Structure formats: structure tokens, C-alpha cells
Regions:
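N-terminal secretory signal peptides that target proteins for export/translocation
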Residues: 1-25
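C-terminal segment of classical bacterial N-terminal signal peptides
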Residues: 21-28, 41-49
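A composition-driven surface/loop motif
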Residues: 2-3, 9, 30, 34, ...
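Enrichment for repetitive, rod-forming helical segments
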Residues: 12, 36-37, 758
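Long, contiguous ectodomains of secretory-pathway proteins
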Residues: 85-87, 108-114, 119-121, 128-133, ...
Length: 766
């Protein structure tokens, strides 16, 4: 150790010499030197150095100082510690000492755990009062705490305390767990990078990382290898067990932007999110995550067990946003979703960006992605997100809602339907969505309604309903309201026995005359849908309402079947634009319902192909299902068929019949009907003998007409319905489109529409 004298001499610029060669100084000189040394020592601020703190040496308390941390261990206190590192002398032997971190408002504490092992679990030695037990590492205060991981760290807490505890209150700050540096302190970015790890285990009713008993928890993870296990009733990462009567605690607020995470919740709790009677708010932007609930009622990622002790739901809700990273597995407990809500909660799930969900597995009666039993769901899947597998073991939707409620009441049954609202858009891809039984692949769980929108460039591989559940739409006893728009591909929408491929579940009966299954399929500027749907086959007994009553096979698109003598819900099905549909019935009707039979479509665009087959393989296609391209003339021309005498002074235009090669007019069934064309000066008029009719041209025809001097087109149908369009305006609408681009001009009673290449340009009509 350098003496004060030597330090003073160095400061003065002198090199000390040994006492053997120093002449004896007078007392006065020695006094002067001592006075100078004392003055220097008192006036200097010694630099703060990093220090390692060993947990075996006692409990450690850390708080934020002015330029670093204030660290206290036993009788030792150090101010302004700029690099606080906590270690174990022997990480193979757990210490029973603890770490307490407190960050005041507006300040940040940075701490490194370096191969620390703490175990303060004493079982139930002190009874059932959490205050009698210890916490391995506790984070408090209104400021922020960052914990860096080096090596392998293990934290195990006692009864009522989280392994790494951070209780969320109105005034609390944030806890961030990170692995920003290598174990030697160097920056990441090489092949020799090391990964710090943390294994945290909570005591009874306490999270592995997050909230303690009857407390909410807040956790942010940016990196590292994290393994967290919650105690009974608590999340692996998130909330401790709440109190359903006091309505306190249990909520989990978790953000993950990196790392490899394995989280296991205790019974009634989520793997990541809410504890028992708690809600889960989880945001994932990156990382590789495996999250599992054990026992009952908690989601893999999302809400814990929701209860209604006093007519008000306490907990259960799951709000999950995943915009990146990989969910390797998210498994919910019995009656809970894989990703979404726990028992009775609302599942609000957004999956977007480049997120990948490899496997989302709902427990029995819970959805793979969506809600638990008796809960509704609001789901958006968009961007470039990929869902490889979303599945319910039974009665929940693969993607959608959990099971609804059905119970006897007097001579009847009370049906309390859940609702699965699902939107799939952008470039999202669903490879497999499946229900084990009763629920839909995408939409409603058993005893659930499915409201589904699929649009943009979305791709659906397999959407498979369980017995009596639609592939896309309603679960058993539930209607389906499905909208499919744009460049959507559905490779296989397979209904379970008695249920539609797309539409309603089996045994769905109307509450009112207005109760309908609704399916809308149409092309947009994004492109045309390509759909393959198959209705479920016969169910020989085992139905929900009457287990002895068999059910007939169902439509590929439309309604599920009902028992003999029951009233089947009708279907409203609309198809617009250009579509490709391959529909195979499980019974007799491919597209429609048993009451009205096959639904017919009219006015579809050129290129449309609808194929219909019944369960026997017979073709049951309808007129208008196939709309072929008209033969393109080599050179469309306008030729007078009867010339009128020219006026003597040339001042009067005469209307004359003409023929436009390649132009045809079709009726509502897609069949060609008689039409005439006349020209008066620069105006060409097309007349059709029908109230509902479509004139079919191509842009090549219109360009030729312009070259021949035609400036205005008129389309006239019965009841004196006429609309006009400027040739220049029509060509300017799609100036770069090729000659073969279809132009379809439709009159439907008093309404008129104009499409060019499938795009709506009705605004051009006058």
C-alpha cells in the first residue's frame, strides 16, 4: 500500500528515496512535511474503483449514488461504485445471504451478477407469513435497475417471494435484465461471445421473476439465457398470485426484446404474464421463447386464472403483442389459451412484423391463439408473421375463441356463445390452425361464433375444424361470418363432421329469422382469391344437443347441418369479381345450405372458375360458375351493317348499326344475350335486352374504337337505364394495362358498375 508520504511526494513531482540515504531532518521540517501531506489528503477526491462483492461475505444493499452506486455489506460501505459486480466464491454452493437494490426516482442502478448462487428457500419453517421469509434478490424504488448477467446465476427465494423480485406499483421504476457484454467485459460481436444466464425460482404464490404474493410484477428482458419457474399460483415471469376478493395483485407486465427464455408458470398462472386472478400484458419484439402453464387455467403467454367472485371478472385477460422473434412453444393449461387469455378472460392478441409462432397449444377448451374458456378474443395477424401451428386440444379454436357455455334450464338449454374475432391480413401466413373437437380451425370455439376477415396477400395452409366445427367460421352451435378479399390463398378449409369448410358450425339453429351464416368472397386490386374448401362428412351420433341424432354432411361453403326436424341456419353467400373456388361438399350442397340448395352467382369477371362437387364426387356446378375470356379478335373493327344516305348538306349525323368484333353481353347467369351496337358521330351505343346485364370488352377494343374516332360509349339496358363513359377517361384510368385487360360494364337494375382488370372504376360513369 502506498503511504500518504509517498503519495504526497508523487503529487509534488518528487520520487521518494529510501530512509537509509535520507539525511536526518529537523523537527520543524518534519512538521512542515506532515502538514503539507495532511492538506493534500484532505483536499483530494480519491478515484472510485470497481470492486467485486462476494455474496458469502454477507447481505448486500445497493442504492443509487451521485456518480455510481452506494454499496453496503456488513460494516463496509462504498460510495460511487461505478461497476458493482456480485460474485460467489464457490458457485456450486448456494449462499443464504441476499441482495437488495433500491433505485430512487430519476436514478439508475447498474449491477452485474457474475456466477452468483443464492438459495433462501426454507420451506414452511416459519409458517405462512411471507414477511418471515427472505428474497434472493429484491429490486425496489421509483428509479430503474439494470442487471447484467455474467456466467451462470441461480436465485431461489422463500415462501411468498419471487426469485428475482420486482413488485410493480404506481410509483415503481423498471427492472431490466440484460446480457450486453461478454463475461470478460468485452463487447459482443464475435464468434467467442459468451452468454450470461439466470435461473430464478419463486416461492409459494410468487413469480420466478416479477411479483411476490398478492403483488403485480414488472420485468423487461433484453438478453441472456433465462429460465424462470413460478410458485403455485404465480407466473414464471410476471405476476405473483393475486387476491380475488381484495382484487389486488396478480398482474404481469413483461417486455422481451432478446434472449432465450424458458418460463413455467405455477397452477392457475401463465408461463409469461399474469398470475392467478391476474391479467397479463406481454410485448415481444425479439428473442426465442418457450412458455408453459402447468395445471389449470393459465395461458402459456398472457392471462392467468380469471374469477368472478362478485359479478365482476378479476383477472384472466391477456393482451399480447408479438412483432418479432420466435415463439418456439406457448402451451396453455386446461381451459386456457396457448397465447392469449386464461380461463374466462378476454384474449387480445396482435402478431405482426416478422414474428414466427412455431407452436401455440391451447389446453382443453382453450384456443391455440385467442381466449380461454368462456372468453372472447380479438386477434390481428398481419405483416410477414408466420404461424406454423396453432391448435386446441379440444373445444377451443385453433385461432379464435375458447369454448362457450351450454347448460340446461327447465325444459330448454341456455347457450352462452363466445366470440372469436380474427383478422388475417398483409403477407401473414398460417400453416396450420386446428381444433381437436367442437371448435373451428379459425374462428369460434365450441359454442362460439366466428367472425373472420382474411385479406391482402394472406395465405392459409390448413384450417381444420374439430367434429362439428367449421374449418373457418363457427364452432358447434355457432354461426360464421367470414370475409375473404384480395390475393388470398386458402389451400384447405376443412370442416369437421357436420360443419362447413367455411361458414357455420354443426347444429346451429336460428335465434331469429335474421340469423345467418355469412360468407363474402371477392377480388380487389390486390388480386383474386384462390380457395379450396371441404364440408365435413356425416356424424353418426355424438352431437352436442342430441348425442343419439346423426348429422348429415355439410356444405363446403355455407351452413353446417342439423338433426332431422331441426331448423338449419340459412346462408348469405356473395361472390364478386374474379375468383377461383374448389368446393367439395360433405353432403349434397357444395355452396349454400340445405334449405335453399346451391347458391348461384352472376356478373362474375372473366377468368372466374368455381368448381362444385357433392360428397359422391358428382359435379353440381351452376350457370355462371365459369366465365371464360372472349376470343380476342386479330383486329377489332367497327363496320357499318347498313349505311344510311348522307344528308345533302352534311350538317346532320345519322345513327347507324355497327358491329364491334369481340364484344359480348351476358345476363345474370353469365350466358350471352342479344345486343346491338349503333354509332352516331363519335358516340357508340350498346343496347342489351335485359334488366341485369354486363357488357364485356377489352382495353384493346377500346383503343381501336378511339383510333376509329369514337369518343363516347353508351350502355343501355331495359327500363331505359343508360350510362356513359368517355373513351379517353376510360383509357387514362389504366394507361399501362395490356390490350387483353378485361373491361366489364354492368347494369343491375338501377345500379351501374365499371371494372377494368378487376379494379372498380365506376366513378367514370355518368
Amino acid at each position: 500500500m502506498i503511504s500518504y508520504r509517498k503519495l504526497a511526494m508523487r503529487v509534488l513531482g518528487h520520487s521518494p528515496v529510501s530512509a537509509a540515504r535520507t539525511a536526518r531532518r529537523s523537527t520543524a521540517k518534519r512538521a512542515a512535511a506532515l502538514a503539507l501531506t495532511a492538506a493534500l489528503v484532505v483536499g483530494m477526491t480519491l478515484p472510485a474503483f470497481a470492486q467485486d462483492w462476494y455474496i458469502e461475505d454477507g447481505d448486500i444493499s445497493i442504492s443509487a449514488g451521485e456518480t455510481g452506486n452506494k454499496v453496503t455489506q456488513g460494516s463496509t460501505t462504498k460510495e460511487n461504485d461505478t461497476d458493482t459486480v456480485i460474485k460467489s466464491k464457490d458457485s456450486s454452493t448456494a449462499s443464504s445471504n441476499t441482495v437488495t437494490i433500491n433505485a430512487d426516482e430519476g436514478k439508475t442502478v447498474n449491477v452485474t451478477l457474475d456466477n452468483v448462487t443464492i438459495n433462501v428457500d426454507e420451506g414452511y419453517e416459519h409458517g405462512y407469513d411471507p414477511n418471515a421469509y427472505k428474497t434472493a434478490v429484491s429490486v425496489t424504488g421509483s428509479g430503474n435497475t439494470n442487471i447484467e448477467l455474467n456466467g451462470n446465476n441461480t436465485l431461489t427465494s422463500g415462501y411468498g417471494h419471487a426469485g428475482l423480485e420486482h413488485n410493480k406499483t404506481d410509483g415503481s421504476g423498471t427492472l431490466t435484465i440484460q446480457d450486453e457484454k461478454n463475461d470478460d467485459g468485452s463487447a459482443k460481436g464475435s464468434a467467442s461471445d459468451t452468454t450470461g444466464s439466470l435461473t430464478a425460482t419463486g416461492g409459494y404464490h410468487s413469480a420466478g421473476i416479477g411479483g411476490s404474493d398478492k403483488q403485480d410484477g414488472q420485468v423487461t428482458i433484453t438478453g441472456g439465457e433465462i429460465t424462470a419457474t413460478g410458485g403455485n399460483g404465480a407466473a414464471g415471469i410476471g405476476g405473483g398470485a393475486g387476491d380475488k376478493y381484495a382484487a389486488v395483485g396478480g398482474d404481469g407486465d413483461v417486455t422481451i426484446s432478446g434472449g432465450t427464455i424458458t418460463a413455467t408458470g405455477g397452477s392457475l398462472a401463465a408461463g409469461i404474464g399474469g398470475g392467478a386472478y391476474g391479467n397479463g400484458t406481454v410485448t415481444v419484439t425479439d428473442g426465442d421463447i418457450t412458455a408453459k402453464a402447468t395445471g389449470m387455467y393459465g395461458a402459456g403467454i398472457g392471462g392467468g386464472f380469471g374469477a368472478i367472485p362478485k359479478d365482476t371478472l378479476i383477472g384472466g385477460n391477456g393482451t399480447v403483442t408479438i412483432s418479432g422473434g420466435t415463439i418456439t412453444e406457448a402451451s396453455g393449461g386446461y381451459m386456457a389459451a396457448g397465447i392469449g387469455s386464461g380461463y374466462q378472460g378476454l384474449g387480445t392478441v396482435t402478431i405482426e412484423g416478422d414474428a414466427v409462432i412455431k407452436n401455440a397449444q391451447g389446453g382443453e377448451a382453450g384456443a391455440g391463439i385467442g381466449s380461454g374458456t368462456y372468453g372472447d378474443s380479438e386477434i390481428i395477424i398481419r405483416g410477414d408473421a408466420v404461424i406454423e401451428n396453432a391448435e386446441s386440444s379440444a373445444n377451443g379454436a385453433g385461432i379464435g375463441s375458447g369454448q362457450g357455455d351450454l347448460y340446461p334450464d327447465g325444459d330448454g338449454m341456455v347457450i352462452d356463445l363466445t366470440v372469436g374475432n380474427v383478422t388475417i391480413e398483409g403477407n401473414a401466413k398460417i400453416e396450420n390452425a386446428k381444433s381437436g373437437s367442437g371448435g373451428s380451425g379459425i374462428g369460434g370455439g365450441a359454442v362460439g361464433i366466428g367472425n373472420v376477415i382474411i385479406r391482402g396477400n394472406a395465405q392459409i395452409g390448413n384450417a381444420t375444424g374439430g367434429d362439428e366445427g367449421a374449418g373457418i367460421g363457427g364452432g358447434v352451435l355457432g354461426t360464421g361470418d367470414v370475409t375473404i378479399e384480395g390475393n388470398v390463398t386458402i389451400e384447405n378449409a376443412q370442416g369437421g363432421a357436420g360443419a362447413a369448410g367455411i361458414g357455420g358450425g354443426a347444429e346451429t339453429q336460428p335465434d331469429t329469422e335474421d340469423t345467418r351464416n355469412k360468407v363474402s368472397i371477392k377480388s380487389t386490386e390486390a388480386g383474386s382469391p384462390n380457395i379450396t374448401a371441404k364440408g365435413g362428412g356425416v356424424l353418426n351420433g355424438g352431437g352436442v344437443l342430441d348425442e343419439n341424432a346423426p348429422l348429415a354432411g355439410a356444405a363446403a361453403i355455407g351452413s353446417g347441418s342439423v338433426a332431422d326436424g331441426a331448423t338449419e341456419v340459412k346462408s348469405d353467400i356473395t361472390v364478386e369479381g374474379k375468383v377461383t373456388i374448389d368446393a367439395t361438399s360433405g353432403g349434397n350442397v357444395a355452396i349454400g345450405d340445405s334449405t335453399n340448395g346451391e347458391t348461384r352467382f352472376s356478373g362474375l369477371q372473366v377468368g372466374t372458375t368455381i368448381t362444385r362437387r357433392n360428397a359422391k364426387g358428382d359435379d353440381v356446378s351452376q350457370p355462371g360458375d365459369v366465365v371464360r375470356e372472349p376470343e380476342k379478335p386479330a383486329q377489332p373493327t367497327v363496320t357499318p351493317t347498313e349505311r344510311a344516305e348522307a344528308p345533302s348538306n352534311g350538317s346532320v349525323e345519322v345513327e347507324r348499326p355497327v358491329t364491334v368484333e369481340g364484344l359480348y353481353v351476358a345476363n345474370v347467369l353469365g350466358k350471352q344475350i342479344t345486343h346491338t351496337c349503333t354509332q352516331n358521330g363519335t358516340t357508340l351505343t350498346i343496347r342489351a335486352n335485359g334488366i341485369v346485364a354486363s357488357a364485356h370488352l377489352t382495353l384493346g377494343m377500346v383503343r381501336t374504337l378511339k383510333a376509329q374516332g369514337v369518343k363516347t360509349l353508351v350502355f343501355t339496358t331495359l327500363l331505359s337505364r343508360s350510362t356513359t363513359v368517355s373513351v379517353d377517361a376510360l383509357l387514362a384510368a389504366e394507361p399501362d394495362a395490356p390490350d387483353e385487360t378485361a373491361v366489364v360494364w354492368t347494369h343491375t337494375g338501377p345500379r351501374a358498375a365499371l371494372t377494368i382488370g378487376g379494379a372498380d372504376h365506376s366513378a367514370l360513369l355518368k
